[in-house]
Amino acid sequence: VAIVDRNAEDGEKTAAAIRAGGGNAIFAAADVSDEASVGKAVAEVVGKLGPVTALFNHAGSIVIKPFLETTLQEWEWLMAVNVRSMFLMTKAVLPSMLKAGGGAIVCTSSISAVAATPNEVLYDTTKGACHMFARAIAVEYRERGVRCNAVCPGFIATPHGNREVEGLTKYGVDVSDPTIAMQQGRMGQPDDVAGAVVFLLSDEAKFITGTQLFVDNGFTAV
């Protein structure tokens, strides 16, 4: 396993935890929204571990504010973090994946790709792009042995999820515990999403590509 992130401290800790559990893991520092940085990191990973056969595009952030208060700079920044990162990482990894005979890619989208939320126009737009990026890659590379799917979490108890709840509450959007319980039963946990990602990357999902797996306990089914 290779972890590619700009947060070296947390990345190294995660790699160390994987190794402590008996796995083989390395960390490669990179800003995944920067082409040169991504190229260098992927070359390092391939040099140390060989061809990449599984890729999880998970970098993401959020902007929460009324649309008319958002700026072009915020739009471009969020597009870079949430969408350009997937483009760059996938483009850098695909050559070695194709050389290895195929592989699997999972992109983190969100319920926000299909369920709009007030004050999240920028975020919702990026997640809609993630949705279609995964589908388009799946269609183009199916015959070459590469699968690509999107995983779409609901509200998850992570630093990102907690920031979203705080930000929406600030603007009067009801994301209280009772409301979230009504929408999706409970707050999701990181393991709920991790299990779905591992499944989509595994051979158990060998006939699944170009789809979106909603990990939201029924949020989008209502």
Q: Which positions does each model-derived feature cover?
A:
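Short, small/polar-rich loop/turn modules that mediate ligand/substrate recognition or access, typified
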Residues: 56, 142, 147, 208-210
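Substrate-binding pocket helix/loop in short-chain dehydrogenase/reductase
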Residues: 66-67, 74-76, 178
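Active-site loop immediately N-terminal to the catalytic Tyr-X3-Lys motif
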Residues: 68, 115-121, 143-144, 185, ...
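C-terminal substrate-recognition "lid" of short-chain dehydrogenase/reductases
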Residues: 87, 186-215, 220
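Active-site helix of classical SDR
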Residues: 90, 126, 134
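Alpha-helical segment proximal to the catalytic Tyr-Lys
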Residues: 95, 139-143, 206
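Residue(s) in the substrate-gating loop at a strand-loop-helix junction
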Residues: 110
